[in-house]
Amino acid sequence: MITLLYRIYQLFIGLPLLVILTIITALEVGIGTTIGNGHFWGYYPGHWWGKLILKLFLIPVKVEGRENLEKDQSYVFVANHQGSFDIFIIYGHLNRNFKWMMKHQLRKIPFVGYACEKSHQIMVDKRGPSKIRKTYEDAREIL
C-alpha cells in the first residue's frame, strides 16, 4: 500500500514539480550566466535543484569520504548511471563546482540545453573524428 501511495505521489506531485523546478533552474542558470558570475550561476542553482529534487522524492543521501577531497585539487568524477537519481546526487551532494560531459543531443532539450550551453558544460559529439577532436578542444578550453 505504501508503495502504491508513493507511486501516486511521484506521478502527480513529484514529476510535475520536477519539470517546473527544472525549467526554473535552467532559466536561472541561463540568465544568471549571461548577466553575472558564471562560476556561481553555472553551479549553485543546479546544486540547490539537486538537493531539492532528492528531498521532493524522499531519497535519503549519505555521503562518505568527501573530507578526502583536497580543496585546490582537480578531480574527474564519474557517474555509473545505474539509477535515475545519480545526476541529482552529484549536483546536490558533491559540493564541488564541476562541468558535465554529456551527449550533444541533450542540447536539444528545451531550457536544459540552453542552460548547459550558457554554463559551458561539455557537449560530446561522436559523429566522426573531426567532431571528437572538437569535443577534446572544447573540453581543454573549458577546463
What kind of feature is each model-predicted range?
Residues 1-62, 114-115:
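A transmembrane-helix-recognition feature enriched in membrane-embedded lipid enzymes
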Residues 56, 60-143:
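Soluble catalytic domains of membrane acyltransferases
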